[in-house]
From Swiss-Prot:
Tetramer of two alpha and two beta subunits. The gene is glyQ. It catalyses: tRNA(Gly) + glycine + ATP = glycyl-tRNA(Gly) + AMP + diphosphate. The keyword ATP-binding applies. Keywords: Aminoacyl-tRNA synthetase, ATP-binding, Cytoplasm, Ligase, Nucleotide-binding, Protein biosynthesis. InterPro entries: aa-tRNA-synth_II/BPL/LPL, Gly-tRNA-synth_heterodimer, Gly-tRNA_ligase_asu. It is found in: Cytoplasm. GO terms for molecular function: ATP binding; catalytic activity, acting on a protein; glycine-tRNA ligase activity; transferase activity. Its EC number is 6.1.1.14. Belongs to the class-II aminoacyl-tRNA synthetase family. GO terms for biological process: glycyl-tRNA aminoacylation. It is an enzyme of class 6 (ligase). Its main location: cytoplasm. This is Glycine--tRNA ligase alpha subunit.
């Protein structure tokens, strides 16, 4: 490669590529979450019969992974580029390799391996067949074919491609520390993010009010339940995300025991499952608006029998 792509040029290249494959370009969802999978643009849209093709950048917060900005590769917050396609194209892996070529990575010149790594997210009742993608010995992407989301079987199957943008950029720019990544011409990643990394790490590990977080979890859980009683799927799911992030803060602080941890995860999972069922029922009531007319009529007729 002649000029190395900046972080934002990597994003722009991936956006253009997946736009050309028919994906809608969504924006990052405005609630804290631990992974792009937890965005409603993936979690909710992966279930039910309607087609869905979307791509978006998702900042992902993992309080327990914070290292005060001192670790070159471990972060409180990193960025994922998320692609979800339902139904899954038969050539999704070929499309992925083509996207790497657009980034200047020729698959014929590098050791690219798909390493089996089936995926599970216990807190949302989700699982699928998966592979890690390793580029010259470094994991850069997670591939998943969802089999279950929110405790519901997926049909049709959704394919998810999650690029780790920091790792990808480190490789492309040949730097050893994420903080040396060039975000834009003349601006390094560390100049933007190293201070927030330090502050969030200090807060997560030392400063956060455990009693407040415990109370907030209970309040968020209760409010999610109230929203669901009114059939309000999206506000309810916002509170599921708040429960998840609050739990992650408690976990980072060491405020929950091993047995309590399992209990909190089960509480989040139970809410997520009700949200998923309610969402599917809502889409059916609306007549599956994203389906083509013929498929919609056939499916609604089958449901009415």
């Amino acid at each position: 490669m002649s000029k190395k792509l900046t972080f934002q040029e990597i994003i722009l290249t991936l956006q253009q590529f997946w736009n050309d494959q028919g994906c809608m370009l969504m924006q990052a969802y405005d609630n804290e979450k631990g992974a792009g999978t937890m965005s409603p643009y993936t979690f909710l849209r992966a279930i039910g019969p309607e087609p869905w093709n979307a791509a978006y950048v998702e900042p992902s917060r993992r309080p327990a992974d914070g290292r005060y900005g001192e670790n070159p590769n471990r972060l409180y917050q990193h960025h994922q580029f998320q692609v979800v396609m339902k139904p899954s194209p038969s050539n999704i892996q070929e499309l992925y390799l083509e996207s790497l070529e657009k980034l200047g990575i020729n698959p014929l010149e590098h050791d690219i391996r798909f390493v089996e790594d089936n995926w599970e997210n216990p807190s949302t009742g989700s699982a699928g067949l998966g592979w890690e993608v390793w580029l010259d010995g470094m994991e850069i992407t997670q591939f998943t074919y969802f089999q279950q989301v929110g405790g519901l079987a997926t049909s049709p199957v959704t394919a998810e491609v999650t690029y780790g943008l920091e790792r990808l950029a480190s490789y492309i720019q040949e730097v050893d520390s994420v903080y040396d990544i060039e975000w834009a011409d003349g601006v390094k990643y560390g100049e933007i993010f190293i201070q927030p990394e330090y502050e969030h790490s200090k807060y997560s590990f030392e400063i956060s009010d455990q009693e407040m977080l415990l109370e907030n979890f209970d309040k968020f859980e209760k409010e999610a339940g109230r929203a669901l009683e009114e059939g309000l799927v999206h506000p309810a799911y916002d509170y599921v995300l708040k429960c998840s992030h609050t739990f992650n803060l408690l976990d980072a602080r060491g405020a929950v025991s091993v047995t309590e941890r399992a209990g909190y995860i089960a509480r989040i999972r139970n809410l997520a499952r009700v949200v998923a069922k309610t969402f599917v029922a809502e889409r059916k009531r609306l007549g599956y608006p994203l389906l083509d007319e013929e498929t919609r009529a056939k499916l609604l007729a089958e449901d009415a029998e």
